[in-house]
Amino acid sequence: MEVILLERVAKLGQMGETVNVRPGYARNFLLARGKALRATENNKKHFEAQRAQLEARNLERRNEAQTVAEKLDGQSFVLIRQSGETGVLYGSVSTRDLAEVVTKEGFTVERGQFVLNQPIKTLGLHTVPVTLHPEVEVKVTVNIARSPEEAERQARGESVTEREQFNLDDLGLEVGQALADAGEGADDRG
């Protein structure tokens, strides 16, 4: 199915281009979201008549996205989640969670603007791309931790998933004596 793009669509084309796409993609995504028109003669004439307005609207949206991008680029956000000893989360962090935390900080970002190939399932610092406009993309850092103190440690670069190493001798026990005492107790029971 041939469609006329009303805005830039990633991996497809620029505004005003006539492209051939599968009918399902056209109906369910491009046409439904107002990103394209069917490429009929009437629509082509209508598009050419409205082209200046569409380009002005697109430029305005891009400028708005650019101002938000200047404030948002490089920002770091903290999410507190429960996890196991190894740092694997109980559950995961999705685009909905990211949109909530960024919105609480005063930015207007929708969940569809975050680019995640799969949900985040581990503690740590994660860099997430945010597409504010088809031509404007920024990266934010998400710090996922079990507590605010742990988030601060992660931000400094410390690993929070390593288990604390300790030495039995540091605990004030003599290992040889403790093992010998345990062995004598076993002989008494036998």
Swiss-Prot record:
Annotated InterPro entries: Ribosomal_bL9, Ribosomal_bL9/RNase_H1_N, Ribosomal_bL9_bac/chp, Ribosomal_bL9_C, Ribosomal_bL9_C_sf, Ribosomal_bL9_N, Ribosomal_bL9_N_sf
Highest taxon of source: Bacteria
SUPFAM superfamilies for this protein: L9 N-domain-like, Ribosomal protein L9 C-domain
A GO cellular component entry from the record: ribosome
Transmembrane stretches, start-end: none
Entry coiled-coil feature ranges: none
Biological process per Gene Ontology, one example term: translation
Keywords assigned by UniProt, alphabetized: Ribonucleoprotein, Ribosomal protein, RNA-binding, rRNA-binding
Any one GO molecular function term: structural constituent of ribosome
Family: Belongs to the bacterial ribosomal protein bL9 family.
Function comment: Binds to the 23S rRNA.
Name the UniProt record assigns to this protein: Large ribosomal subunit protein bL9
Organism: Methylorubrum populi (strain ATCC BAA-705 / NCIMB 13946 / BJ001)
